[in-house]
Each structure stands twice: as C-alpha cells, then as structure tokens.
C-alpha cells in the first residue's frame, strides 16, 4: 500500500536506552494525481469526488478527512503555485477555492488538484507556498476559511452548476462529464459553503 513517509525521531529515555519513536507512514489515499476525477474550474465537485472515492475505498479514513473552502466577501483570494497561474510564481486570484485535507494524527496532508505542488503536500509547506502571508495583501484580498467534515460535505453539498453559466445559458467553462451533484434538501447550495460569514453555518 502506498504511503507518505515522515522523518524519523529518536528519543532517549531516562533509562539511557535509545528508543526509536518513528511514526508509522501515512496512508496515501490517492496513489497519483491522474487517478482522481478532475474538471478544471470545478474545484468543489473535484473535492466532492475525492470524498466519494474515500467513502468507497477507505471508508474508515473518512472521519479523518475535511473539506476547506477559501474565499472572502469580495470573492478575490490570491493563491500562489496554482497550475492556472502565470509567470514564475503561478499566482491566481480565485473567487473561491477548495481543498481536501487528511489528518490521521497530528500530521496533515493537503490534496489540491489545482496546485503545482506535490500531491499530496504537508500542510505547513502548502500554506507557506500557497497562501504566504496576509501582511503583503490589501484587506480585500484577505483569505478566510470554512472547514467541513468530509462526511457532512458528501451528505449535504449540491450544485446544479448555475454559477458556471452565462446569461445566455452557455458554459463559462465546460462542465464535468457526469450529472450534477444533488442532495435531498437542495438542488444548489454552493454559495452557503463559500459564504464566510461566521453567523451562517452550512
């Protein structure tokens, strides 16, 4: 089974005996990026598909998985190291973005199908290279985050893709090759997840 290695840690006990306290490798949920269902410009559905895949192949790990929406009131969030970015730093200003997190213990892996970073990437490296710091940004570009458990996201998320259509009904970007994701309660609730108002819970 593929896994992600973690640096070894050697600790000396009071007895003077050196004990190896190496953490066990983290299960690599997706062996390679190309194995994942991916449609450019539909990050919310890409992540939903990752959650669905885990619920089928590694159902016991779903409790350790989370979905993170990134946005703000002005819908302008700068992210670096994005495949759609231009020039050397690969900067993109999205209206929103979405990530998949896996936290089996005190370690955390980020799966971002739109990033040029390794797949997956440890959280600290991902945050450092993708978000950098708000100190260099104007307030309208500050990033806010909504974190949802993968199981709840699977159960409640719905999108009829209306946000990807122009007023004449044509597509801004080609849609995925499968039917829209629906829930029993709502045909479309994407805006509820993107909304960063802390008083409104998805």
Name the predicted role of every residue range.
Residues 2-202:
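A structural boundary/capping signal
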């Amino acid at each position: 089974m593929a896994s992600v290695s973690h640096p070894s840690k050697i600790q000396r006990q009071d007895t003077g005996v050196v004990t190896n306290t190496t953490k066990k490798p983290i299960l690599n949920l997706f062996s390679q990026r190309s194995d994942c269902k991916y449609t450019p410009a539909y990050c919310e559905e890409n992540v939903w598909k990752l959650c669905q895949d885990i619920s089928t192949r590694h159902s016991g790990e779903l409790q350790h998985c989370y979905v993170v929406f990134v946005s703000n009131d002005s819908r302008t969030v700068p992210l670096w190291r994005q495949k759609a970015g231009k020039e050397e730093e690969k900067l993109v200003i999205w209206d929103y973005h979405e990530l998949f997190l896996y936290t089996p213990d005190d370690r955390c892996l980020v799966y971002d199908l739109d990033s040029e970073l390794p797949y997956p990437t440890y959280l600290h490296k991902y945050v450092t290279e993708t978000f950098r710091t708000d100190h260099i940004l104007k307030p309208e570009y500050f990033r806010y985050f909504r974190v949802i458990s993968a199981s709840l996201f699977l159960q409640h998320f719905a999108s009829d893709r209306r946000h990807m259509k122009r007023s004449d009904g044509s597509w801004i970007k080609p849609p995925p090759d499968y039917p829209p994701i629906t829930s029993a309660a709502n045909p479309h609730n994407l805006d509820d997840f993107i909304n960063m108002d802390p008083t409104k819970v998805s």
